[in-house]
């Protein structure tokens, strides 16, 4: 169990690093929502990322695009490897 000095030190760390402020802003935003979201945790994740200047939807799209590109390049490597193998057999 942590002693009170350790807890105060950790609290100070969270305040100095902006964590408390960011969490407070997101929770206030959730509180002020007229239509409460069905998934409060998803709201917090999305808006916490936004408060840090991160566009979660854009990152998800970029991730999907990169996965598709990796898949296409993997297929191309496989195709070229087969061609090289066939050429080396001749």
UniProtKB/Swiss-Prot annotation:
One of its GO terms (molecular function) is transcription coactivator activity. Keywords: Nucleus. GO terms for cellular component: nucleus. One of its GO terms (biological process) is regulation of DNA-templated transcription. It is found in: Nucleus. Belongs to the AMY1 family. This is c-Myc-binding protein homolog. It comes from Dictyostelium discoideum.
